[in-house]
Amino acid sequence: MKLTMFVVGLLGLLAAPGFAYTVNINGNDGNVDGSGQQSVSINGVHNVANIDNNNGWDSWNSLWDYENSFAATRLFSKKSCIVHRMNKDAMPSLQDLDTMVKEQKGKGPGGAPPKDLMYSVNPTRVEDLNTFGPKIAGMCRGIPTYVAEEIPGPNQPLYSKKCYTADILWILRMSFCGTSVETY
C-alpha cells in the first residue's frame, strides 16, 4: 500500500508540470513607455489562460476562461476589474494561443498588426460575480468590477470616450472605454 501511494505521488509530480506552464515574453508591449514584461500561463486542464503584464503602475492581469466564455482584466492602476464575453472570432483558441506564445517567445513585434477589440464599460458595478464562473469571481472578488460590451468594428473610429488599452503579445489589442475611465 505504501509503495502504491509512493508511485502515485511520484507520477503526480512528474505529470503536473505538463498541465500548466508559463512563458515569459520580454519587450515592448505597447503600453505607456514601452517597457515591461508579459507572461502567459496556460492551463489546458481548467481551460484558462492567464496573461500578466508587469509594467509598474500600469500593470494588469487578464484571465481568459474558455470554459465559461468570459474574460476579465484587472487594471491595477484603476484598482478595478472589467469582465466581458470572449469574442471567439478575434481571440485565439487556447490551442492557438499556446502556439502563438511559443512562436513569440524571445521575439518582438512582427507580422500582421494585432486585432483590435474595443469595449464600452458599463459604469454600474457588478453585484454578483458568480454569474461569470468561479475563476473570474475569484480574480475579481473584493475589488470594483464592471461589465464591458464589445463595440462593433465599424463604430470604433466614431467612439470618442477615454480608453485604457491592453496589448496582448502583439496579437490582440483590447481597449476599455467609458464616460469616466478614471473611475474603473
From Swiss-Prot:
GO terms assigned for molecular function: growth factor activity
Stored PROSITE patterns: BRICHOS
Broad class of the protein's primary localization: secreted
Signal peptide region: 1-20
Keywords: Disulfide bond, Golgi apparatus, Mitogen, Secreted, Signal
BRICHOS domain span: 54-148
Entry GO CC: extracellular region; Golgi apparatus; secretory granule
Tissue expression profile of the protein: Expressed in the stomach. Highly expressed specifically in surface cells of the antrum mucosa from where it is secreted.
Cited Gene3D superfamilies: 3.30.390.150
Coiled coil, from the record: none
InterPro entries associated with the record: BRICHOS_dom, Gastrokine
GO biological process: positive regulation of cell division; positive regulation of cell population proliferation
Compartments (UniProt record): Secreted; Cytoplasmic granule; Golgi apparatus
Disulfide partners: 81-140
Annotated SMART domains: BRICHOS
Pfam families in the record: BRICHOS
Function: Has mitogenic activity and may be involved in maintaining the integrity of the gastric mucosal epithelium.
Family from the record: Belongs to the gastrokine family.
Name of protein: Gastrokine-1
Species of origin: Mus musculus (Mouse)
Gene that produces this protein: Gkn1
